[in-house]
Amino acid sequence: MELEKRLKEKLEAPTLDYEKYFSEKALGMKASEIRELLKLVETSDVISLAGGLPAPETFPVEIIGEITKEVLEKHAAQALQYGTTKGFTPLRLALAEWMRERYDIPISKVDIMTTSGSQQALDLIGRVFINPGDIIVVEAPTYLAALQAFKYYEPEFVQIPLDDEGMNVDLLEEKLQELEKEGKKVKIVYTIPTFQNPAGVTMNEKRRKRLLELASQYDFIIVEDNPYGELRYSGEPVKPIKAWDEEGRVIYLGTFSKILAPGFRIGWIAAEPHFIRKLEIAKQSVDLCTNTFSQVIAWKYVEGGYLDKHIPKIIEFYKPRRDAMLKALEEFMPDGVKWTKPEGGMFVWATLPEGIDTKLMLEKAVAKGVAYVPGEAFFAHRDVKNTMRLNFTYVPEEKIREGIKRLAETIKEEMKK
């Protein structure tokens, strides 16, 4: 009790002006709004449609146990040792083969580096490619943590709107022409083309190919983030942009977080060896190497065919939850509310009538027992207030229905004002 009291006193009345020791960049850092929101609802009776968490029921616990036992019996010396910065070679070989077979991407182990989740990959891309003032194109809306990772390196963000077919490349072309007239050029276009986070939409094949043409014409690189691509519940698959990349302009990001388990913190970058080499050097000073033990388990998971067998089970588990959310939205939402109808992934994006600020409305929703992520944080310029992201993978169908019902009641009350 005495220790708890002292800790509380230190928090309430700090003995130093700690702020003065932080760098200017550190002072500019802001906590993830989603992470802070999750703290708010994690211990309450609130139905949370806010997080981006995979359902624990989809974790292949039994398989992981068997693989872990085998790794400790046969590969302990490697698995428990430091590894190379570029990654565990057998895993990189297995990933290259998997991407060739799955996506028809001509790739080898020299094109792949493992990372501590794809979030680290985003930070490394910022370190290696972004100078202050560089123009980075992002989708509007886009992945909040990508904005956080890139913002640290002080780029200028340009937003391109999404529609039901993903990034509007016609508007992108207009913006590229406009910037060219001003003597400016884009360095990176960051996109989540398949089951986009937060919107859930998918870029069609025609737009993917056109984006590559624009990259060549205007000399920029594409960062293709694909954490959700395997989670397809309906519709026809679309190849990654990387599959048509003949010039080596696409830096592809993959992750095991949604197809194995996020706790392993294993992602990978697939790119031209020239890019990989510089990213590898940047990673050396960050964490020396990605968790070797996790990499060896991931290798066995891919090599043993468990990955391809497990993905359909994840899809079978999530599809009813996606369907339950779409059905509940149709049943309960008032006129004037619109939402996306994703063919896969983890999220639905809702747009409310103009004048409703979903960030201000959140407290009222939580009071009714439901949480969501306000959409403002997903825009680089934070200029859209009437949107929200809803997650359907973590909560059971019956709670999804009840959560949407509570949310609709909150929205109806706001619309009466």
Swiss-Prot record:
Temperature dependence: Optimum temperature is 95-100 degrees Celsius.
Cofactor(s) needed: pyridoxal 5'-phosphate
Molecular function in Gene Ontology: aromatic-amino-acid transaminase activity; pyridoxal phosphate binding
Sites of N6-(pyridoxal phosphate)lysine modification: K258
Signal peptide region: none
UniProt record, GO biological process: alpha-amino acid metabolic process; biosynthetic process
Keyword Plastid: no
Protein name from the UniProt record: Aromatic-amino-acid aminotransferase 1
Organism listed in the record: Thermococcus litoralis (strain ATCC 51850 / DSM 5473 / JCM 8560 / NS-C)
